[in-house]
C-alpha cells in the first residue's frame, strides 16, 4: 500500500485514498499510518468513514493520530455508510446522524468539547492530552460523501468539501455545488473530489472491449450490487440494466429479497472483476460511470467536470496500479 502512495507522490498526484469498509477492506488507519511515514507531501484520505461504523471518540482519535504523523495532510471523508453498512446487512445511517457525526469530529479535532450521548447518558467530552495528536494549527480536511443534494447541503452547513462516486455528469456537479453554497452560512472551505475508474484508449481501441471491462468493471459492478441489494432502485432502471441485475443475482446465487443476500453480493466488492462477469459490464454503464476514451476525449470530459466544480479526480486501479496511476498523472498534469 505505502509503495503506491510513494509512487503517487513522486508522480505529482495530490492525494491518496483508502476505503473504510471493514468487511471488505483492511483497516484504513493502519494503512495510512504506513503511508504517512513513507511520504512527505501527498494528502492522505479515508473515503469514507461513517456513524455507527466507528464511535465518535474512536474516529476522532484515529484521525488525530494520523494527523500527528502527517500534519495538515489528512482528509477525513464522512458518509452514511452506503457500502460499509450494507456489507453488514444494515441500511445506511440517516442524514441527521451524519451531520451530527461530522460536526463532532470537526469540533474534537479542533480541540473543542462536544456533547457525547450513549442512550440516556450525556457527557461533555474533549481530548484530554496536549500532545502532537491535537494540532489545530495543522487542521484535518473534512469532506462529506454526496450522491445527492441532501448530503451536498450537509457539506455546505458544515463548510466541508465534497466527495462523490462515479457521478460524471457536469450538471449533477453544478447542482451539488449550488446545494452546498446555498446551505452554507459562511465561506465554504474544501475541495470537491470525484472517485471513478479510468481507462485511456489507444486510437481505434474498443471502448467496450475486455481490457476496458477489466479496468473499470469494478465501478460498474458496484452499481449493479447496489441495484441488486435495493430492488426499488432496480425498478427505475432501463430494461437492459434490469436484466443485468437479474443475471448478476443469479450468478451470485441469491435474490433481491433474501435476508443474507449481502454476503453474496458484496464478495470481492470493488475488486477486479472475474472474467465470467464481463458480460455484466454493459456499454451504457461504462459510458455513464467510468472515464473511458482517448487522451483527447478524456481531457475534454475532465475539463467539463472541472468547470462544474470538481477539483480532483480520484481513481481506484485494479489491473496494473502503477501504470494506471501514471496514466492519471499524465492526464491531470
Tell what function each PLM region has.
Residues 58-190:
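Internal, glycine-rich beta/alpha segment that forms the wall or movable "lid"
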Residues 1-8, 62, 146-153, 294-304:
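Short, acidic/polar
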Residues 17, 43, 75-77, 163-164, ...:
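Conserved beta-strand positions in the central sheet of alpha/beta enzyme cores
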Residues 20-27, 51-57, 167-173, 200-201, ...:
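Acidic-and-aromatic substrate-binding clefts and catalytic sites of carbohydrate-active enzymes
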Residues 12, 35, 66, 105, ...:
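Conserved, mostly hydrophobic/aromatic
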Residues 1-46, 140, 318:
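N-terminal beta1-alpha1-beta2 module of alpha/beta enzyme domains
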